[in-house]
Amino acid sequence: MSKEPDRLFAQPLEQVPDFVFNEDVVQVFPDMIKRSVPGYPTIVENLGVLAARFAQPHSALYDLGASLGAVSQSLRRHVRSDGCRVIAVDNSAAMVERCRQYLTAQDSMFQELLPVQVLEADILTLPFEPASVVAMNFTLQFIAPEQRLALLGRIRQALLPGGALILSEKLRFADDQEQQLLNELHLDFKRANGYSELEIAQKRSAIENVMKPDTLETHKERLHAAGFSKVVPWFQCLNFASLIALP
């Protein structure tokens, strides 16, 4: 399973289509996310560490919007609670197929990993089992804003007492100066990782209609409205952050 460099937007396009998680994206996704999301490896590895604190025996651990299963792999490496299993969910058939391949490869490299189930499903309609950990790693921002509260409410209902939702998202900022500065720093991060001005511009055009970031304040207000009692930011790098939401 070779990991190809991300060159999806390297050539000029007459019309830039909306971004979709198709086979072309799957082929370059590991390179794309590493070069586009500052702090991504730190978030993924520590999601497993955080989950180990909240995981409870004989409960589900959800990876919602699993893409290629990086978070699922981290959960399996770090959680040791008896009877837990990981449920990885994505609505992209191409992502699900490759995710299964990566998780099968992980099985061959490690012993005593948690069992994992990979589902091709829509998390907006998926019935949730009782869960001690739910991870949403840069997933909510691709859900229509008007559907986010209901989804979080269903997740809250599925969470066991003492469990946690771990939510990672790109942020926007109400203060114009803060927004401009962090956006420019993020562009500098992409340039430092080898993306050209053309690639940056075309990727922005592709994704601006399908990814709708919220402010940190909006996230906190929505999570409280969904029934969570406490929201704790645990990581931020530029305009990317991760939160722990407690029931």
Curated annotation (Swiss-Prot):
CDD domains to which the protein is assigned, alphabetical: AdoMet_MTases
Q: Where does S-adenosyl-L-methionine bind?
A: 40, 65-67, 90-91, 122-123, 137, 204
Class of the enzyme per the UniProt entry, highest EC level? transferase
Q: Name one Pfam family in it.
A: Methyltransf_25
Q: List the disulfide bonds.
A: none
Per the entry, what this protein does is: Catalyzes the conversion of S-adenosyl-L-methionine (SAM) to carboxy-S-adenosyl-L-methionine (Cx-SAM).
Name of this chain's protein: Carboxy-S-adenosyl-L-methionine synthase
The protein's organism comes out as Pseudomonas entomophila (strain L48)
| Upper lineage | Bacteria, Pseudomonadati, Pseudomonadota, Gammaproteobacteria, Pseudomonadales
